[in-house]
C-alpha cells in the first residue's frame, strides 16, 4: 500500500515540478510585457480551464507535462494584428533569454529549496567519494544465504583476531596497496589463507596477519549479468559511514549552496556517461541484471519514490526529487532545439550577428527561420523519443529497486 502511495506521490511531485517550470516561463513573460495565450498542465483533452485576463489556464487529461503558449516564440508563427508588437521574437535579447531561462531556473530553485529543507530536518550527506579504507566495524564472517540475506555467525572475525578495530585505516593487504574500502574488499575477495595486512592507527603504521575466510557471496560475473553465488574471501569488516551534518536556519544557507555545487558536478558526470549506458539498458530489457547506474525515466523515478516511502525513507524521497529537478533544469539548457537552451542559443546568435552587422554598417538580418532548423530539430526529437521509450521499457520490465 505504501509503495503504491509513494509512486503516486512522486509522480504528482514530478508533475508539480513541471508545472512550476512552465510557471517560470509564464511569470517572466508577463513581467516583461509579452503575451501568454495559454498555460496548461498536462496534454490531450481539456478537463478544466478558466480565463484570467488574456491568458487561459487549464488542466488536460494526460498528466505527462505541460506547456506555456507565449505569443511569437518564432518568426514563422501566425499572429493576430494586436499581437505583433508583443511577439517574443521581437523583444530585446535579454527579455527572451530571461523568459527561456526562467523555466530551468525554477527547477534549480526547487532543488535548492528541497536541499535546504533536508539540511534543516535530516542533515546533508557527504557526496565526496572516500579516499581511505577506513574500518567502521569488525564482525564475524557470515555466509550470504540468499541475495541480501546473511546467515548466523558468532565470535570475533578474522580482522578482529588480527587486531583491527573501528577507525583503523587499511593501506595494504597482501602485496596490494588499497586507497578505498571498496578497493580493499575487492582484493580480499580474491585472496585465501593467511596474508599480511598493513593499517594505520593514530598515524602509526601497524603490520599484522589476517586469515582470509572463504564464504559465499552473490556476485556478478560481468557488467549487467545476474548475481550468482560464489565463494570469495572475507575478513569480517564493515565500512565507516559518515553521518549527515545537521545545520541551523542560517548555517544551512551556505551549506545548501556548497552541497548543490557538489551535486551539480556529480550529476554532470552522470549525464556525460548516459550514451555509454544505453547498451546496458538494452541488456536489462532482455532479462539481464539491471545496472543501478543506468538512466531511468519518470516511471523508474516514481518506482524509486515508491520504494523510499514504503521503507519510510522520506529524506531519500525528497533528495531524489531535488536531484531530478537539477537534472531537468540541466537538460533543458542543452543548446539544441527543442530544448529551452536551443531557443536561448538562437536568441544569443541573433544578437551577436546583428551587432557584427551593425558594426559593419549593414542592416540587421531577419530573425532565424525556424523552418530551416526543423530537420535538425526532428533528429534531436528522434533521439529524445527513442531514449524515453528505451528507459520507460526498461523501467517497466526490469526496474531499478532500492531494496531488492
Swiss-Prot record:
Topology relative to the membrane: Multi-pass membrane protein
Subcellular location: Cell membrane
Main location: membrane
PDZ domain segment(s): 121-203
Coiled coil: none
GO biological process: proteolysis
CC cofactor: Zn(2+)
Keywords, sorted A to Z: Cell membrane, Hydrolase, Membrane, Metal-binding, Metalloprotease, Protease, Transmembrane, Transmembrane helix, Zinc
Any GO molecular function: metalloendopeptidase activity
One Gene Ontology cellular component annotation held by this UniProt entry: plasma membrane
Gene3D superfamilies: 2.30.42.10
Active-site residues from the entry: 22
Residues where Zn(2+) binds: 21, 25
Keyword Membrane: yes
Protein family membership: Belongs to the peptidase M50B family.
Described purpose of this protein according to its UniProt entry: A probable intramembrane site-2 protease (S2P) that cleaves type-2 transmembrane proteins within their membrane-spanning domains. Regulated intramembrane proteolysis (RIP) occurs when an extracytoplasmic signal (possibly oxidative stress) triggers a concerted proteolytic cascade to transmit information and elicit cellular responses.
The protein, known as: Zinc metalloprotease Rip1
Classification lineage: Bacteria, Bacillati, Actinomycetota, Actinomycetes, Mycobacteriales
Gene: rip1
